[in-house]
Amino acid sequence: RIDRCTTCHVFIDKVGYEDQPNPYKTHPKVDTLAVGVDSAHPVKEFGCTSCHGGMGERVNDFNAPAHTPQNQEQAKLWEEKYGWHEPHRIPSPMVPVQYTEGQCIKCHKEEERLPMAEKLNEGRQLIEDYGCYACHKIEGWEHLSKPGPALTKVTSKVNSLEWIKNWIWAPHAFNPKSRMPHYFEQHNNSDEESKAKNMAEVNSMAEYIARTSKTYKPIEKYTGGNVANGKKLIENIGCIGCHQVEGVDERFAKVNEKAGPHLINLGTKVNPDWLVSWLKRPDHYDPTTIMPSFRLTDKEANDIAAFLLASKNKDFGELTFPALNKEIRDEILVNDYLSAFETIDAARAKLEKMTDDERTLELGRRSINKYGCYSCHDIPGFEGDLPPIGPELTKEGSKPIEQFGFGQQKQVPHTRHDWISQHLKTPRIWDVGVPKIFRDLYKMPNFYLSDKEVESMVLVILGLVDSKIPLAGQKRLDANEKMYQEGMKVANKFNCYGCHKIDGIGGSLSDAYEDNRDYGPPYLTDQGHRVQTAWFYDFLKNVHPIRTYLDVRMPTFNFSHEEINKLVMGFQAGSKQLTFEEDVKIVWEPGEKEAAKQIWEELACTSCHALGFTKEDPLAPDLRFAKGRLRSSWMDAWIANPHSFLPYTSMAAFWDDGEGGLFPAVEVLDNDPKRQIKAVRKLIQEFGLPTQPKPFPKNN
């Protein structure tokens, strides 16, 4: 491939022209991300069109490279200024600049998250949050679990069949921030005839779900609780790391995590006994859930339940869904299903042999299959490896524009990004003005996405292309990197990123503690170097307290043995640690131990690390367990310069980044910082306890 873009963009790889207009401007992040000679993607190796698309070999005028404007306003400006016109017969015109980041996917197919690609990471997260991968096959996303809750025991969870019907019909009427989309009353089915048929479908689906639901007996009883304390617990123990919760304080309300549902109006939705049981033992109701246990006491669980149950949607709870119209039910069964391979008369004869209940359940089953409910939810009767309901998106960014159905929507510009954007905003609009029978209508539901969400998701979809990148140009993972990515897939599945910033990515909940990050979930920076592998494995199996002074809790997850191994080995590989442990043999040099004690006293280590040493409240982790938990080499690096690992830590850098003298000055060990640090570390390891703290009971 030949790129001649620098014929016009003459200073694109040179620092100092950041404030110039195009085409004389310096490329963003020129020294770190792209173009610059010292960047990750030097222009002489990667060119321009590998990221931006277009025809880089054609530079005879402004239109030749297939420039694509960001929006209609820029298109008009270009028309006036450069005589721009829409590229014709060019399979891959330039990607609008707001979507460029999505092109990283072409070369970085195996990586879960990319540093310096915030918008791409956000788009990927949105596609996961809204469960697009469940209805549309996307190569590389097959490991993700179903995004919706299991409906196998749903009648033990929700208050009534009427609630199920009204929820299926209009989920946002109950929960405005729900990720459950709207299938009904859209552009192509809001006429009275379609609504009547859709109501018959909803009645039948709800009946099918209710009739096939297994009985579940809650293991706890709701006894009432303290609403104020429940609110405090939700804010402080870590629920906000996965859930948006109505009614919490502002600093927690701004945490925009969507791994779990938005918790609002539960008093109208759920059985109180079920809720307390779920809070105590999520895996008892759903053995495959990613919802962890916070090891709540009975009082804590009841207090949290009291707060959640206090939120109600009275109007929704009093709604009565229109009764099933059996005539319409039978009409749909005959015309849309039973006559598919039979004559109408034969279909009617088949219907006559079915009881009233059988007809309702048959339409329910058929409708669940029609709308693909099984893609997001486990539903009895839909077990097994069923095909996704929607078309595959693996190469959607390369799909010829002629294959996008614009229908009668002449106002939508004929580009990939404009069609995909419009489709995400109003997916049924393509049927408007097009004569279709009921069963052939578009079925893609409406998620009511914001413009910002749409832009981020389009960015990702445009990066899903059928490109032939040479192996030398692809990011090919070595054994360590592959192991790290496998671990991060597990971290993503259980939303570890919601609480923790992992190697610079994620950490929404920790941002709520910006005034004092020491009291939030810790950053997991160089975690595989920090902790010993055996300790980490045991900790994830049996969580025990490390920072006993914190309100926020590390929960107990329902990890499989394989998932724990992938996490532990992933972090170890990410930190390039080749051994499980570092052999700790404490051998003192003459006078070294006395010097270590002198430094320990001078620095007043126990003023923060109080546990086991003083009766003061601790402000830092219990050092008695450092020997079995931390690696020696990491401890040396941490003591020398803690802020290089955690910029927010209150731990002081006593050794001036490990290079200068000790402050306050203690003239021991020849004033050698490395010897002093090593001596302190050995002292900590020597008084370390041989065993870990007693783990919490697994499910209490």
Show where each model-derived region lies.
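Short metal-binding segments enriched for Cys and/or His
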Residues: 42-45, 54-62
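Electron-transfer interface patches adjacent to heme c in soluble/periplasmic c-type cytochromes
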Residues: 37, 41, 50, 54-55, ...
